């Protein structure tokens, strides 16, 4: 199945980041917090304004981003894999 986000929506796949405790122990499962990094796999056409103009998004497919996992982030299972659908406003930074 292919997803095509609308307007300023972005679809990303969460990147798992190895989490270590202060003592160097690798944390897994419930002891590890979910990563707020993801790889952009699809972007919408842009932010639509009331006057009808469209502003292109700052992120593109392939970008690795840090996002704010809050109220506006929607998690979906597509073909057995979790993807996140969020507004570009929920993206805090692009990792370069």
Swiss-Prot record:
The keyword Cytoplasm applies. It is found in: Cytoplasm. One of its GO terms (biological process) is chaperone cofactor-dependent protein refolding. The keyword Cytoplasm applies. Pfam families: Cpn10 (PF00166). Coiled coil: none annotated. GO terms for cellular component: cytoplasm. Keywords: Chaperone, Cytoplasm. One of its GO terms (molecular function) is protein folding chaperone. Together with the chaperonin GroEL, plays an essential role in assisting protein folding. The GroEL-GroES system forms a nano-cage that allows encapsulation of the non-native substrate proteins and provides a physical environment optimized to promote and accelerate protein folding. GroES binds to the apical surface of the GroEL ring, thereby capping the opening of the GroEL channel. Belongs to the GroES chaperonin family. Heptamer of 7 subunits arranged in a ring. Interacts with the chaperonin GroEL. NCBIfam families: PRK00364.1-1. This is Co-chaperonin GroES. The gene is groES.
């Amino acid at each position: 199945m292919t997803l095509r986000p609308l307007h300023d929506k972005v679809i990303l796949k969460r990147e798992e980041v190895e989490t270590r405790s202060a003592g160097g122990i690798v944390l897994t499962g419930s002891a590890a917090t979910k990563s707020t990094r993801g790889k952009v796999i699809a972007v919408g056409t842009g932010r639509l304004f009331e006057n009808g103009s469209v502003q292109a998004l700052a992120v593109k497919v392939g970008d690795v981003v840090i996002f704010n996992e809050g109220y506006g982030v929607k998690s979906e299972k597509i073909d057995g894999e979790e993807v996140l659908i969020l507004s570009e406003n929920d993206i805090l930074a692009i990792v370069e």
